Amino acid sequence: EMVDYYVGIGANGLEMDVSFDSNGKAEYTYHGVPCDCFRSCTRSEKFSVYLDYVRQITTPGNPKFRENLIFLIMDLKLNDLEPHALYNAGIDIADQLSKNYWKDDGKARAHFLISIPYVSQTAFVDGFRWWFEKKGLEKYYEKIGWDFSANEDLNSIQATYQKLNITGHTWQSDGITNCLTRGTERLTQAIQKRDTPGNSYLNKVYAWSLDKYGSIKQALDLGVDGVMSNYPQRMVEILSEGTYLERFRLATYEDNPWETFKQ
């Protein structure tokens, strides 16, 4: 229901909040309290069911196919998990993607950004990659990108990617719940890092959750690659006017989400 609603009003990407049991099994797409203002925080769906539904609407030829939905962000709720459970969570997400999203041999075409809160939670990445390689899923790495979402020091995030030997397919988020206002200092720093010659660890920058017209425009003026909003129709409206119409457009499937765009 919510997927159809947001895609219907113009969203080309969706965020799913993924909750886990204590062993690292992904259970529900669910946020819980607190969440963004003016949103229902308590809706939930089984993770496997959600993945299967977005598979259908991102598969060309499926009766439910929606051409504009091209990008899915998994906001992983990992903060209560012990290291062994983080590793298991990585295995489980990789396994569920292969069974519930790519089960038609990869005909479903969306790209996934896997958003991990903290750099201390890299056991998740280890588990995910181990399962990919064990099961021969390497061809799907092209569909996977990475993000650390807890607004940590950008140099620490860069060092973590180096340690993990990740040199591409990375987005950097910066943001806070729409209930609060946040300065743009770190967001600006991330954009500067993205645009530094020789940078190989940061491809794209996005801001969240921006719902006011002025906040969305400010982020675009700074040069972000994406905006997460509870009101995607406002972004569509902004991009249809003035200088924004000249400088920006909504991404389509033909665009590479891992390629740094030079303005």
Curated annotation (Swiss-Prot):
EC top class, as a word: lyase
Cross-referenced Gene3D superfamilies: Phosphatidylinositol (PI) phosphodiesterase
Tissue: Expressed by the venom gland.
GO CC annotation: extracellular region
Cofactor detail note: Binds 1 Mg(2+) ion per subunit.
EC code(s) of this entry: 4.6.1.-
BP GO terms, sorted: killing of cells of another organism; lipid catabolic process
Top-rank lineage group of the source organism: Eukaryota
Catalyzed reactions: an N-(acyl)-sphingosylphosphocholine = an N-(acyl)-sphingosyl-1,3-cyclic phosphate + choline; an N-(acyl)-sphingosylphosphoethanolamine = an N-(acyl)-sphingosyl-1,3-cyclic phosphate + ethanolamine; a 1-acyl-sn-glycero-3-phosphocholine = a 1-acyl-sn-glycero-2,3-cyclic phosphate + choline; a 1-acyl-sn-glycero-3-phosphoethanolamine = a 1-acyl-sn-glycero-2,3-cyclic phosphate + ethanolamine
Subcellular location(s) of the protein: Secreted
Key words of the record: Cytolysis, Dermonecrotic toxin, Disulfide bond, Hemolysis, Lipid degradation, Lipid metabolism, Lyase, Magnesium, Metal-binding, Secreted, Toxin
Binding residue positions for Mg(2+): 15, 17, 75
Gene Ontology molecular functions: lyase activity; metal ion binding; phosphoric diester hydrolase activity; toxin activity
InterPro entries for this protein: PLC-like_Pdiesterase_TIM-brl
Active site location: 31
SUPFAM superfamilies to which the protein is assigned, alphabetical: PLC-like phosphodiesterases (SSF51695)
Cystine residue pairs: 35-41, 37-179
Cofactor: Mg(2+)
Family membership noted in the UniProt record: Belongs to the arthropod phospholipase D family. Class II subfamily.
Function according to Swiss-Prot or TrEMBL: Dermonecrotic toxins cleave the phosphodiester linkage between the phosphate and headgroup of certain phospholipids (sphingolipid and lysolipid substrates), forming an alcohol (often choline) and a cyclic phosphate. This toxin acts on sphingomyelin (SM). It may also act on ceramide phosphoethanolamine (CPE), lysophosphatidylcholine (LPC) and lysophosphatidylethanolamine (LPE), but not on lysophosphatidylserine (LPS), and lysophosphatidylglycerol (LPG). It acts by transphosphatidylation, releasing exclusively cyclic phosphate products as second products.
The protein's name in its UniProt record: Dermonecrotic toxin SpaSicTox-betaIF1
